């Protein structure tokens, strides 16, 4: 994780609610790897401390994130970084692979999407 852990997020969300009780908060540009295939940025040793680079790791990250932010009434938005990202014939994503919510090989929705959808009202 680039910017901290879920427990650190919880602390910051609580502080934001205390200092700015009338302000909505949105979590933006979040994502988690599901594979390190063909992606020079996805280094297993860099992220394994938090969540393994796997479909299961991405799903667990998403589940824990949604579970945490649903405990904070001031969180009104959750935006995944490039959820439609898919290498299937898409040169735009060269170097930005394996963090979307669709499998690069099949184009099918990944299990993390089910967890992501739990945020919706």
Give the role of each language-model region.
Residues 1-46, 63-70, 74-75:
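Glycoside hydrolase catalytic-domain groove-lining segments
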Residues 35-43, 47-64, 68, 72-121:
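Aromatic-rich peripheral "rim/lid" segments of glycoside hydrolase catalytic domains that contact
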């Amino acid at each position: 994780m680039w910017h901290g852990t879920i427990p650190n997020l919880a602390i910051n969300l609580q502080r934001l609610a205390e200092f700015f009780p009338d302000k909505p908060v949105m979590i933006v540009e979040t994502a988690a790897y599901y594979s390190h295939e063909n992606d020079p940025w996805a280094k297993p040793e860099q992220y394994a401390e938090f969540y393994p680079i796997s479909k299961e790791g991405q799903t667990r990250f998403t589940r824990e994130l949604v579970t945490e932010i649903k405990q904070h009434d001031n969180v009104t938005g959750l935006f995944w970084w490039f959820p439609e990202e898919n290498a299937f014939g898409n040169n735009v994503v060269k170097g930005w692979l394996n963090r979307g919510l669709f499998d690069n090989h099949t184009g099918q929705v990944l299990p993390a999407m089910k967890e992501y959808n739990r945020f919706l009202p």
